[in-house]
Each structure stands twice: as structure tokens, then as C-alpha cells.
From Swiss-Prot:
SUPFAM superfamilies: alpha/beta-Hydrolases. It comes from Xanthomonas campestris pv. campestris (strain ATCC 33913 / DSM 3586 / NCPPB 528 / LMG 568 / P 25). GO terms for cellular component: cytoplasm. Residues 86-350 form the AB hydrolase-1 domain. The lineage of its organism: Bacteria, Pseudomonadati, Pseudomonadota, Gammaproteobacteria, Lysobacterales. Keywords: Acyltransferase, Amino-acid biosynthesis, Cytoplasm, Methionine biosynthesis, Transferase. Transfers a succinyl group from succinyl-CoA to L-homoserine, forming succinyl-L-homoserine. This is Homoserine O-succinyltransferase. The record marks 209 as: Important for acyl-CoA specificity. It catalyses: L-homoserine + succinyl-CoA = O-succinyl-L-homoserine + CoA. Transmembrane segments: none annotated.
Length: 369
């Protein structure tokens, strides 16, 4: 096990949630490269309602599927009541370890609306774990498989003394990683919720991403890779959302500016590209985009109860693919279908509807609706 080395702040090491060892064939290949990991831990005062929170790093040696043995750094955040059921949460390739603002980490998180009092992901009743995906900092210039992400999560659980997750909630790319985790480490997971993520990359979506990566490559040829990345993100926004939403939001006549036509959606797309470039290393985007297209599992290998959430009109993960996934899961799988104008981004917009699904899926013995 990896030993936690706390910082100078008020600290409490994460409690071991289950003393039993859980062997896993895939995990037997993972060894820690260092017995030490740094952690920044917060324990609230006795009269505080704030849950404990820890943010830390550790180093592992991981045999990657397409890149051989690598020394990798994992960055994680764990927030919630000690001894509460642990739920791992993972999002799209832009997501990170910080889910939502807390007493000790007050900055806004990427899934703010779904985490909080009264929600299925309530730190008062769940312990929420997340990490930065392998490759997210841009330092890993090698093919990254979703299986690598799943094995890294298993190594993180070992380091934190967590034998088994109560739930894994994955959105988009996180759903692909969740399916891999459920396939490779089934003994360590009770329930999977996979939102807008299938057992394979749809050929249409893979073609979209291939063109986005070519946009980045053209930018690199012109020594303007950030312009290429911004353009790739703008293309992506068209695939994340739906024609219906664009019709409602941007149905204004074009303008003539300096003799050029500018359509109503361009300001929105420009802002989306600029924001993405400001926070995303080019190499991180390229390698994680490729990782989506490398993803493929056999649904029959997923041996845990799995709730699959599909969105009608999702152009990246069509409903038909998720129907095929659930059919392959057999009695372990169930399907929920949402109608939303937000397409692939519905998991970030349809907060109450997603929360209702999570509440049912993650309910523990003795809990009521």
C-alpha cells in the first residue's frame, strides 16, 4: 500500500474502508514506483458540517496497453464523510479531479450542479473520489487506452486503502473508463452508471475526431497549434450539441463585417475555442481524443449491474449503440433514455433528471426515495 505523507495543514489520513484484500488479474501487473505520496488533507472542526477533503498525488508504474511500462503520476481528490460508501466520478476528456466547490477547495468544479446537499452525490452521505485522467497534463506523449485509465484507478484505490467502490459514475469518456473498470476490476465495483458512453467509438464520431486532430496538425505546421486546437474545439461543439439548440439560440440573420459574412453562432464558437485553449495542453487533447477512438470492450465482460443512460439526438454516442450495449450486458444492464436539446452535453445540463437516475442507481440498503 502507498503511505500517505500529509502536508503541514490539519490532517487525518484517509481511513481504510475495508480490510480485505481484493485480488484482480489486471491489477497484479500494477506496482507502485514510490512508497510515498503527498496529500493535502482537511479535517473540519467538530462543530462544522463540512465533510473531510483530501487532494493528493502518487506515482505508479503501469504497464500500458500500447506504450509499455511507464512511470505515471496520479492526482486525485477525495471528499466526503469518512466510512461513507465511495463513489468514483469521471467525466469527459476535459474533466478533472475537482468535482465541486467544498469548504477547503472552494473553486468551482466541473460537475457543480450534481454534487451537494440532497443530491445523489452528496458528500454528507457519499465519499466522492475523482482523478485527473492519465495524459491530462500533456506530459504523456503515447497512446492511452481506457484500460490504462481503469488500471490506474485500481492502483489509486489500493493506495487509499479502498477495497471496493459502491459506485462508478461515468459521463462521456468517463463512461468508457467505467465500462473498462467494470470489465477488468469487477470485484472492486458494486454498480456502474454509464452516461453517454458505449462499448466502442461510433465510426461517425471517430471521423469527427479525426478531422479535429487534423485541424490541430495543420495549426502545428503553421506554428500556430493553439489556433488549430481552438478550431478543433469549435468543431467539437457542433457534435456535442444539436441542430435544435442552435436553431433556438442562433437564429439571427448574418452580419457583414469588413466585407465578410459572420453568422450568429460564431461569437459562441470563438469563446468556446478560446476557453478550451486556455486550460488544455495540445498534447493532452490529441492523446485523449485518440483514447476515445481506441476504446473497445466486450459488453459481456462487464460483470456488475450497469445503468446505461442515452440521450436521443446525441450525435457522438447514438441511441442505437447504447441499445446494443445494454443487449450485450444481458440481465446486468438497464437503459434510461433522455430527450434533450443538449445532445451529448445533456449530462451537464439536465441536472435534475440525471440526479434522479443516480439517486435510484446508487441507493444503498435501507435508503428510501
Amino acid at each position: 500500500m502507498v503511505r500517505i505523507v500529509p502536508s503541514a495543514r490539519r490532517t487525518r489520513a484517509p481511513a481504510k474502508l475495508d480490510g480485505r484484500s481484493t485480488p484482480d488479474i489486471a491489477m497484479s501487473l500494477v506496482t507502485t514506483a514510490s512508497p510515498l505520496t503527498t496529500a493535502d488533507t482537511y479535517t473540519p472542526a467538530a462543530d462544522s458540517d463540512a465533510p473531510p477533503a483530501v487532494r493528493g498525488e502518487l506515482v505508479i508504474n503501469l504497464p500500458m496497453r500500447h506504450a509499455g511500462q511507464r512511470e505515471l503520476r496520479l492526482r486525485y481528490e477525495l471528499v466526503g464523510a469518512e466510512q461513507a460508501p465511495v463513489v468514483f466520478v469521471a467525466g469527459g476528456i476535459s474533466a478533472h479531479r475537482h468535482l465541486a466547490a467544498s469548504a477547503v477547495f472552494p473553486e468551482k468544479g466541473w460537475v457543480e450542479g450534481l454534487v451537494g446537499a440532497g443530491r445523489a452525490l452528496d458528500p454528507a452521505s457519499r465519499r466522492l473520489l475523482a482523478f485527473d485522467f492519465l495524459g491530462a497534463d500533456g506530459s504523456l506523449d503515447a497512446p492511452i487506452d481506457t484500460a490504462d485509465q481503469a488500471d490506474a484507478i485500481a492502483a489509486l484505490l489500493d493506495a487509499l486503502g479502498i477495497a471496493r467502490l459502491h459506485g462508478f459514475v461515468g459521463y462521456s469518456y468517463g463512461a468508457l473508463v467505467g465500462l473498462q473498470f467494470a470489465s477488468r476490476h469487477a470485484a472492486r465495483l458494486h454498480t456502474l452508471v454509464a452516461v453517454s458512453g458505449a462499448h466502442r467509438a461510433h465510426p461517425y464520431a471517430a471521423a469527427w475526431r479525426a478531422l479535429q486532430r487534423r485541424a490541430v496538425a495543420l495549426g502545428q505546421l503553421q506554428c500556430a497549434e493553439h489556433h488549430g486546437l481552438a478550431l478543433a474545439r469549435q468543431f467539437a461543439m457542433l457534435s456535442y450539441r444539436t441542430p435544435e439548440e442552435f436553431s433556438e439560440r442562433f437564429d439571427a440573420p448574418p452580419e457583414l463585417i469588413n466585407g465578410r459574412v459572420r453568422v450568429a453562432a460564431e461569437d459562441y464558437l470563438d469563446a468556446a475555442g478560446a476557453q478550451y485553449v486556455a486550460r488544455t495542453p495540445v498534447n493532452a487533447y490529441l492523446r485523449l481524443s485518440e483514447s476515445i477512438d481506441l476504446h473497445r470492450i466486450d459488453p459481456a465482460a462487464v460483470a456488475v449491474p450497469t445503468v446505461v443512460v442515452a440521450v436521443e439526438g446525441d450525435r457522438l454516442v447514438p441511441l442505437a449503440d447504447l441499445v446494443s450495449l445494454v443487449e450485450g450486458l444481458g440481465p446486468r444492464g438497464s437503459l434510461r433514455v433522455l430527450r434533450s436539446p443538449f445532445g451529448h452535453d445533456a449530462f451537464l445540463k439536465e441536472i435534475d433528471r440525471i440526479d434522479a437516475i443516480l439517486t435510484t442507481a446508487l441507493r444503498t440498503t435501507g435508503e428510501t426515495a
